[in-house]
From Swiss-Prot:
Subunit structure: Homodimer.
UniProt cofactor(s): Zn(2+)
One example GO MF annotation: metal ion binding
Ligand binding (Zn(2+) 1): 68-69, 178, 233
Organism domain of life: Viruses
Catalytic activity: 3',5'-cyclic CMP + H2O = CMP + H(+); 3',5'-cyclic UMP + H2O = UMP + H(+)
Segments for region (Beta-lactamase-like): 21-233
Native source organism of the sequence: Bacillus phage vB_BveM-Goe7
Residues that, per the record, bind Zn(2+) 2: 64, 66, 154
Annotated GO biological process: symbiont-mediated suppression of host innate immune response
Protein's UniProt name: Anti-Pycsar protein Apyc1
Ranges that cross the membrane: none
Sorted UniProt keywords: Host-virus interaction, Hydrolase, Inhibition of host innate immune response by virus, Metal-binding, Viral immunoevasion, Zinc
């Protein structure tokens, strides 16, 4: 049993970044369970470069079905099946996304086999996570680990979720994944969690919270709460904005944070 929960940002980049890997985090819980949050197309390379082989993963949690969050799943599935001898890891998926993840995204490359057509659970141990359109829904995974999913607005008509990570009964981190600016969700996250990792686009308009919106929000909250916010999912021009984020900080790719 480890003393602390740890989070390493595997990638911090936006969907079109060429300097950073797709936004993704590797969480190591106190029982040793290693969870990858989202697996975009460049994330397997990011894991490799950080010294985390695919065989070190125990599970992957998916927050929504954009390619920069699921594009690396096919590689993981095929590697586990053909290189690691059919090893299955957990695939933790919000319940409304289980069917679209397979039917609309993954089956084109994973369905076919010499003997029969395959399904998602031929590659992963699929674990459905509870959701609620009215707020939060919690799923207990084992005696140590639980996840709370929060419905977010990212793209119209697309289901997307933020996730709260709980280890040994303690709220550890709120991870927004992708969402437009949502003052009420931020209020809740900063009240309930010691750390908040929030997506941040460096221009105004679009499908993510902008830096200007987040700066406007933090002007009205205590500095102690501002210090809890790490910004992620940013563009390649991020260096132009270093020192211009108030008390908030840009999450650094590859950096391990003790939660």
């Amino acid at each position: 049993m480890l003393d602390t929960t740890k989070l390493t940002m595997v990638g911090t980049g936006s969907a079109f970044s060429k300097k950073f890997y797709n936004n993704s985090a590797l969480v190591t819980f106190t029982n040793g369970y290693k969870l990858l949050i989202d697996c975009g197309h460049s994330v397997p390379k990011g894991l490799h470069d950080l010294g985390f082989p695919l065989e070190s993963l125990d599970g992957i949690l998916i927050t929504h079905t954009h390619a920069d969050h699921i594009g690396g799943l096919e590689e993981v599935a095929l590697y586990n099946k053909f290189v690691l001898g059919g090893r299955k890891i957990d695939l933790l998926v919000p319940e409304p996304l289980v069917e679209p993840l397979w039917n609309d995204s993954l089956n084109g490359g994973l369905r076919y086999d010499d003997s029969r057509e395959l399904e998602l659970d031929d590659y992963f141990t699929v674990r459905s996570l509870k959701t609620s359109d009215c707020g939060a829904a919690r799923t207990q995974i084992d005696e140590n680990i639980a996840f709370t999913l929060y419905t977010t607005l990212h793209v119209s008509h697309m289901k997307s979720y933020a996730v709260g990570l709980i280890d040994r009964g303690e709220e550890k981190v709120f991870y927004s994944s992708d969402t437009v600016f949502d003052e009420y969700l931020l209020d809740y996250a900063l009240t309930m969690f010691p750390w908040v990792f929030h997506d941040c686009q460096l221009f105004t308009g679009g499908v993510h919270a902008s830096l200007d919106e987040l700066l406007g929000y933090t002007r009205y909250i205590p500095e102690k709460q501002q210090n809890k916010i790490f910004l992620m999912h940013y563009g390649d021009n991020v260096e132009e904005f270093i020192g211009k984020t108030g008390r908030m900080r840009f999450a650094e790719q590859g950096r391990e944070i003790i939660l």
